[in-house]
């Protein structure tokens, strides 16, 4: 008689079923990787220092009372250099800078935030009046950030924001250019860096500031906006009699956003597919939105900037002023739109979009901005070639804009500026205007490679490293 196969013990079947169930359960709760990572501390081994130029009337360059006249060309900041040399700003010196309207923030590689400049709105995050205050015109640490390792900083005209390595956002100062207060629920200016209730359960990976509004981006790709919404820069309608409603951060109807940027009175976002969205003030066509009204009331795609129209290249940075905007692509090309008068866009006279009307005209659809060729030993100061010669090989790595001027840094650390600079914010000495991107060159920059530039109201902060590798 044939033997029957031994029956599988019930306990074994049950255990197998339990194991399978546990396996499925484990698989179901596996968290997906976040769309946007929280910025971490710099891993650089180079010493980063601060260079500055521009207006000094509010102490925004942090040069103390020793500097009474505007700084016409970039110069190494002596106090910060001393702090970096003494390793008081961490192993690699500076990690970041943020120039506001008339105040400045710097982030060191210990994760500490320093401030200097105008403190009428408490944007410095510390007391500056005697007898207990510290000077407002030299770098001093922001108070109330113990245990908070900052990895990113941004600044508006009167507001300051820091993001930590754990995704926490704190802000201080105010939105007061239109009589507004600092934050929902606060009746006065806020000096101590404050966590916003709207983000208590959110991880923030990036932020951006216009003149009087702010954007925050979460790790899951959601954009929040708050501040002054008079020009729809918040992407929603704010009634004049209910202006305080703009002080509460609210999410925008956008998904999978990977970057946010702000012009003076408008806002921008880039999603995972590379599409660019804009909203806010557009009376000079500075958003780039096709056939748009003077106010773009909700996030609207800028079709001209889609990767399909740029051989797959994507926008990675946007820098906007009052009436102009520049867009940096990952190909190193820069495009611009808005008011072209007063040299805002950096277009030469022979550019096809300039010829019809030179006085003051609008560029509705973004056009590419030309840069001089990279310098060589034989030609250390090349000029901009004719438009018909095509675009040079210069690749831009970083851009920043003030109200009426723009800065760009190329891959070799060379700084360019153009636009209006009546307070020496162009860094070109006696030249207060530059029609096209012009190399900023002087003794201080000759030995330094610029890494990051931040354009403030009328002052500029630069992060630089020595080209020879020394401090």
Give residue spans per PLM region.
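PEST-like, low-complexity acidic/proline-rich intrinsically disordered segments
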Residues: 1-24
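Short glycine/serine- and acidic-residue-enriched loop/turn motifs that recur at repeat junctions
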Residues: 14, 26-28, 37-46, 50-73, ...
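Short coil/turn segments that connect the beta-strands within blades of beta-propeller domains
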Residues: 47-48, 102, 110-111, 157-158, ...
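Conserved core positions of repeat-based scaffolds
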Residues: 52, 103-106, 115, 159-162, ...
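Eukaryotic helix-linker segments that join adjacent hydrophobic helices
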Residues: 71, 77-98, 102-178, 190, ...
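Surface loop/turn motifs at the tips and blade-to-blade linkers of beta-strand repeat domains
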Residues: 88, 142-145, 196-199, 250-254, ...
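Structural WD40 beta-propeller signal
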Residues: 100, 107-108, 145, 156, ...
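Solenoidal tandem-repeat scaffolds enriched in leucines and small polar residues
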Residues: 153-159, 164-303, 318
């Amino acid at each position: 008689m044939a033997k029957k196969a031994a029956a599988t013990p019930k306990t074994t079947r049950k255990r197998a079923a339990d194991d399978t169930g546990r396996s499925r359960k484990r698989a179901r709760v596996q968290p997906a990787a976040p769309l946007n990572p929280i910025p971490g501390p710099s891993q650089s081994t180079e010493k980063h220092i601060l260079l500055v130029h521009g207006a000094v009337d509010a102490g925004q360059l942090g040069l103390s009372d020793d500097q009474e006249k505007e700084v016409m060309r970039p110069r190494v900041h002596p106090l910060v250099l001393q702090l970096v040399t003494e390793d008081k700003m961490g192993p690699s010196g500076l990690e970041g800078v943020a120039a506001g309207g008339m105040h400045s923030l710097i982030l060191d590689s210990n994760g500490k935030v320093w401030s200097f400049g105008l403190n009428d709105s408490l944007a410095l995050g510390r007391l500056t009046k005697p007898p207990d205050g510290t000077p407002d015109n030299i770098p001093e640490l922001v108070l109330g950030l113990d245990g908070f390792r900052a990895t990113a900083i941004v600044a508006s005209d009167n507001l300051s924001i820091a993001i930590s390595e754990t995704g926490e956002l704190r802000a201080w100062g105010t939105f007061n250019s239109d009589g507004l207060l600092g934050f929902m629920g606060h009746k006065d200016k806020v000096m101590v860096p404050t966590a916003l209730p709207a983000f208590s359960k959110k991880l923030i990976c990036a932020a951006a500031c216009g003149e009087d509004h702010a954007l925050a981006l979460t790790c899951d790709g959601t954009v929040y906006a708050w501040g002054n919404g008079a020009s729809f820069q918040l992407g929603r309608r704010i009634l004049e009699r209910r202006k305080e409603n703009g002080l509460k951060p609210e999410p925008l109807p956008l998904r999978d956003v990977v970057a946010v940027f702000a012009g003076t009175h408008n806002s921008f976002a880039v999603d995972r597919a590379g599409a660019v969205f804009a909203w806010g003030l557009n009376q000079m066509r500075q958003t780039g939105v096709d056939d748009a009204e003077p106010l773009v009331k909700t996030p609207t795609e800028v079709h001209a900037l889609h990767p399909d129209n740029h051989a797959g290249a994507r926008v990675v940075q946007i820098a906007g002023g009052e009436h102009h905007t520049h867009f940096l692509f990952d190909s190193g090309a820069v495009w611009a739109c808005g008011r072209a008068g007063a040299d805002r866009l950096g277009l030469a006279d022979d550019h096809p979009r300039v010829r019809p009307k030179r006085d003051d005209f609008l560029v509705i659809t973004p056009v590419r901005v030309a840069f001089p060729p990279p310098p060589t030993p034989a030609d250390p100061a090349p000029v901009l070639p004719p438009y018909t010669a095509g675009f040079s090989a210069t690749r831009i790595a970083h851009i920043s804009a003030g109200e009426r001027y723009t800065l760009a840094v190329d891959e070799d650390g060379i700084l360019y500026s153009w636009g209006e600079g009546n307070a020496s914010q162009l860094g070109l000495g006696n030249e207060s205007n530059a029609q096209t991107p012009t190399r900023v060159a002087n003794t201080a920059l000759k030995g330094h490679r610029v890494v990051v530039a931040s354009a403030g109201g009328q002052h500029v902060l630069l992060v630089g490293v020595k080209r020879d590798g020394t401090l």
